[in-house]
Amino acid sequence: FHFDCFWMKEFHWSDFVWDERVFPDPEGMLKRIKAKGLNICVWINSYIGQESVLFAEGVEKGYFVKRTNGDVWQWDMWQPGMALVDFTNPDACKWFQSKLEVLLDMGVDCFKTDFGERIPTEDIMYFDGSDPKKMHNYYTYLYNKCVYELLERKRGKGEAVLFARSATAGGQKFPVHWGGDCWSDYELSLIHISEPTR
């Protein structure tokens, strides 16, 4: 059973906190769903909005991608002032995993790792000094790897699964992937079927 983005409050993506207005008892709800034999997936992404309780913590600890002047890189695409977790920083990855681990302990089984493909390439720097242009594709690998390693640690080898929207070479190590957000017509369906084999 999949919960898409609005399991969290609007403008709080991603804080990994259930919206109590809609889900006043998330643990009880998850237990009821699991009692019916269903596994649970929740939507996440690697952007942390200014309204998220995690934003200040991530800024203070240096867990976000930065501009070359040292400021946190921010973007206003879906919500104001989103920062991007820097998965080249091992501590940032552990921090991100620690937030997801709370959800796994609550009863969530997997994560839909959305986005990861709209990565800046100009005027930014990564913790490990990676080339921003090369990171444009590699970022999604690191994002999915970070989440998958947590799932494997918590659920066991052969039991971990994520639901990834974007991937690059090597992404097949972190199953499964979906080719979503496309039109449902014959021509695009053919492209959609052939693209993964390239």
Give the residues covered by each predicted segment.
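Catalytic-domain carbohydrate-binding cleft regions of carbohydrate-active enzymes
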Residues: 1-194, 198
